[in-house]
Amino acid sequence: MQLIPTSIPEVVILEPRLFRDERGYFFESFSEQRFAELVAPTHFVQDNESRSSYGVVRGLHFQLPPHAQAKLVRVLRGRVLDVAVDVRLGSPTFGQHVAVELTEDNHRMLFLPHGFAHGFSVLSEEAVFQYKCDNYYAPEAEGAIAWDDPALGINWGLPAEAIRLSAKDSKHPRLSEAPQLFNYSTTLHL
């Protein structure tokens, strides 16, 4: 597995080493020891999976302390544009985002530490998406910002007429209006 940096140092891409032959392929999708060597010691406690169809945009979600979640995400089937937005007040990259294409063919994973809002858009007919989280889901700690906040300038890779949102995701506040965010001084710095 190799680490690929992004424009925000704490958000990193992980690319596994594939072994291919006439039967197909094999790769180690996760090793806690290797992850700690490359990124940081992290103990994931919950795996989630979602299935979505073309045009779906999910996000931008996060959980607030003490229930904050770091996530390691990947696509099992299909193709998505995965987005991480820095929501750490005082961070030199506050309000900036990283957008990475994750596919069933590139097998890449994206790591988002505490202090980042997460979302993705589905670019294929269907996508099956997996999240590893270092904290359990806590509905009372849910936070979110608007997927289409003009201050973020996110290009979701979809025509406007194709975008499909849940009722909940269509009502999130802009980053500047979010009632609670993270403090940069209390989050992981790589």
Enumerate the language-model features and the residues they cover.
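Short beta-strand His + acidic residue motifs that chelate non-heme Fe in jelly-roll/DSBH
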Residues: 110, 118-123
